[in-house]
Amino acid sequence: MFYSIWQNIILQKVEEMENTTSLDETDRRILKILQQDSHLTVKELAARVHLSPSPVFERQKRLEREGYIARYMAVVDAHKVGNGILVLCNIRLKQHTQALIQEFMDVVQGIDEITECYNTSGDYDFLIKVYAQDMKSYQQFMLNTLGKIDCIGSLHSIFVIDETKNTRGVPVP
């Protein structure tokens, strides 16, 4: 049963990749530039890729429509808004059933402190990224939020000392 869950996920990813058009060099440059500064106007973006604004606008809209650009968002400084602690938390579920996996994925969607969640292979089932104000607030979060999720079997917290790199983008070959 566990194998069929992974098989379905992999097949879904392959289908997603097949349903997109290929990127040319200009599309790639647009994506790279927008990952660094999505606040650019179409005119500024066009100047950087050496095209007129109209075709750049059309390309950008196509990249959005086809899902290459998922969304635009502001990157907020966690420390300035009072979240001084970043924790990477490995989670192991009690059992590997489709119902428990789905239950966990559904529950984390409603927890604001969890900013990222990855279904992983290896010793743990999920890796979550959690922001907290301080150690005491993380302890309360762990006990009162994560501790109440029935499908969690165990967890392992890793406290980030310093962020040495975070481009918040993906490589565009």
Can you describe what each PLM-predicted range is?
Residues 1-173:
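A compositional/biophysical signature of low hydrophobicity enriched in polar/charged and small residues
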